[in-house]
C-alpha cells in the first residue's frame, strides 16, 4: 500500500473555534501504534502573538502535560502565514496534543492530527460524519 490515504489515520483534533483570545488545546491524541503525527491548524487573523506548540504526557487526560522543546511555531503577521503545522516523530510519551495560543482576537480553524507509520495496517480514520477519500493510481486524462 503506497497510497498516503491508506497509510494514515486522520483525526479532527479540535473543531473550528469562534473569535477569541483564549488558548485552545486540541483533543488528546493517543500515539500507541503510530510512529508520528502531523498537526495542522489555521489562525483566522495573522498576528505575531498567535502560535502553536505540542505537549505530551503519560496520562490519557494530559493532566501531566509538558511542552516539547522547540515546538513553538509562530503564525506571524504576514497573511500568508496563517496555517501552522508541527510534525512530531517518535514522541517519548504516549499522549500528545496541540496547544494553540491566540495573541489577538482570532478564529481558529479546524485542527487536524494525521498519524502515520502505523505498526499495524491499515489504520482507521477517526472522524465523525463523512470522510470521502478516493484513490486513483495512474489515472487517465479526461473528464473528472
Predicted regions and their residues:
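Surface-exposed, low-hydrophobicity beta-strand/loop segments enriched in small/polar/acidic residues
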Residues: 1-144
